[in-house]
A protein has these predicted regions:
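Short glycine-rich anion-binding loops that position phosphate/pyrophosphate groups of nucleotides
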Residues: 11-12, 42-43, 141-143, 209, ...
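C-terminal effector/interaction modules appended to NTPase cores
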Residues: 148-369
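Structural motif
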Residues: 6, 37-39, 67, 136-138, ...
């Protein structure tokens, strides 16, 4: 199977206050997992917990393998009774063993390998990439930029481009000078593009530079953002769903609530995108909209999410695909639209800017809008 992440669920049937917290954690993990190994003791009298887990796992379309843990030889006689109380168990592959017997381990591993079917689709980071072409990474470093390394999306893009026999070229744009209105920074950028033997095939930019890049990028050069690249990659190709959510921006009204969700906990200083730039855009155009934030790898419960008109999510580069897909599933189940940092910042520059950053992905925003 390769490297795996294991979620343990001790205390799932505890009735105490701590037990309730454990249950909440288990059901959060259930949303993110790919495989549920349900260990059942046939000699138990109450199977309400097992019934609840199987029902919820099936609702979430999770694969379930059942392990009957036999503490006594005659415990197997009760399996029919278990499946009368939890009839859904009959629809899943199962094995009988004595978990405390180390000799059962090979049989358990073989059972898992033979029956687990991964649904993880292999995603290409930049599916539009072509061999022997230049690709520009526009990286306007600021006070938040760590020394000695690229950010993860930048490093991933450079590695992917190189691995696929193309040529990544980094460019540092001075946002302050470019926005000051002088011609010097634009001339420097044009000279940079002119220095290639042939046009770069595409530019991948930091989303915060979209106010400049959507007009500076020549029409014959593709354009997208690191945030859009990452959200498509981590969501396993669900970029179009985030594009659909952008329509909720135009319908924001006074009193609406917007959640800005950022999956990491970096130090937020200066002109941070999530806490400064996006909120400033919202307050400028919709001053009476309430803005909340969700930082880190844990997401809000559905009861809280229902109060939001829109969720604007980061690129998701610091969480797993399973965790992001669990967030998407929650939002879709309660009908809350969601979009992405890069899409939002492009949208705020006008329809043509959004069309431009979606073109490399084969998405026609005009058809959606």
């Amino acid at each position: 199977m390769g490297p795996v992440k294991l979620f343990d669920t001790a205390g799932l049937d505890e009735a105490s206050g701590l037990g309730r917290k454990k249950r909440a954690k288990v059901f959060a993990d259930l949303k993110e997992c790919d495989l549920v190994l349900l260990v059942v003791d046939p000699e138990t009298d109450d199977f309400a917990t097992e019934n609840e887990i199987v029902t919820k796992a099936r609702e979430l379309d999770k694969q379930i393998l059942v392990i009957y843990n036999l503490f006594r030889p005659d415990a197997a006689e009760r399996i029919a009774l278990v499946e009368e109380q939890v009839p859904l168990l009959r629809f899943h592959q199962k094995i009988r063993l004595v978990a405390i017997d180390a000799q059962c381990r090979p049989a358990l591993l073989q059972f898992i390998l033979e029956n687990f079917a991964s649904k993880n689709a292999t995603m290409e980071l930049l599916p539009f990439l072509q061999r022997d072409e230049f690709y520009v990474l526009n990286i306007p470093m600021d006070a938040e930029t760590p020394p000695g390394r690229y950010l993860r999306p930048q490093a991933m893009a450079a590695e992917y481009i190189t691995r696929h026999w193309a040529w990544p070229v980094s460019y540092r744009m001075d946002l302050g000078k470019a926005r000051a209105g002088g011609a010097g920074e634009r001339k420097r950028f044009d000279a940079f593009l002119a220095g290639f033997g042939k046009r770069p095939k595409a530019i991948i930019t930091d989303s915060q530079a979209m106010d400049l890049m959507h007009t500076w990028t020549p029409d014959d050069v593709g354009l997208t953002t690191f945030s859009i690249m990452m959200i498509n990659y981590v969501s396993r190709g669900r970029l179009a769903a985030f594009v659909n959510g952008i329509e909720a921006v135009a319908s924001l009204r006074a009193g609406d609530r917007v959640l800005i969700a950022e999956a990491c906990n970096h130090s937020r200083i200066a002109e941070d995108i999530g806490t400064v730039q996006i909120p400033n855009f919202i307050r400028k155009h919709w001053p009476d909209v309430q803005i909340d934030h969700n930082f880190g790898r844990e997401f809000q419960e559905n009861e809280q999410l229902q109060s939001y008109k829109l969720v604007i999510h980061c690129g998701g580069c610091m969480i797993t695909a399973q965790k992001l897909l669990a967030r998407i599933r929650d939002l879709e189940s309660i009908g809350v639209p969601y979009t992405n940092y890069g899409l939002f910042l492009s949208y705020m520059q006008g329809p043509e800017a959004l069309r431009k950053v979606l073109r490399p992905w084969g998405i026609d925003y005009a058809a959606i809008a």
